[in-house]
Amino acid sequence: MIFLLPSIISVMLLAEPVLMLGDTEDADLMEMVQLSRPFFNPIIRAVELVELREERQRDCGHLHDPCPNDRPGHRTCCIGLQCRYGKCLVRVGR
């Protein structure tokens, strides 16, 4: 069995028609991709969580952004800011 880095595997999968791999090499490559899938699943989930967190950060208002309260359930200002005078301003100490 051939041992390749994941990036090389993806390049080889994309270039498969050009390389014209034989049936055995193709089957070995596909088997290796299937066997490596459980290893990469946690990495894929972690990347998805990071993307979700970045999406949530974009959904909030940054400093001096307007913060309309007409969207119920939507966090209008980012963490550390509060909505005052219709804009997201620095949170005043408690």
From Swiss-Prot:
Q: Which residues carry this modification: Valine amide?
A: 92
* Covalent S-S links between cysteines: 60-78, 67-83, 77-88
Q: In which tissues is it expressed?
A: Expressed by the venom gland.
Residue ranges listed under propeptide: 23-58
Q: Which UniProt keywords apply?
A: Amidation, Disulfide bond, Ion channel impairing toxin, Knottin, Secreted, Signal, Toxin
> Does the record carry Cytoplasm as a key word?
no
Q: Which GO terms describe its cellular component?
A: extracellular region
Q: Where in the sequence is the signal peptide annotated?
A: 1-22
**What is a single molecular function from GO for this protein?**
toxin activity
Main localization category? secreted
Subcellular location, record wording: Secreted
**Role this protein plays:** Probable ion channel inhibitor. Shows insecticidal activity. Acts synergistically with the neonicotinoid insecticide imidacloprid. Is neither a repellent that repels insects nor an attractant that is preferentially consumed by insects. Is very stable.
Tell me the protein family, please: Belongs to the neurotoxin 14 (magi-1) family. OAIP-1 subfamily.
Domain free text:
The presence of a 'disulfide through disulfide knot' structurally defines this protein as a knottin.
| Name of the protein described by the UniProt record | U1-theraphotoxin-Sp1a
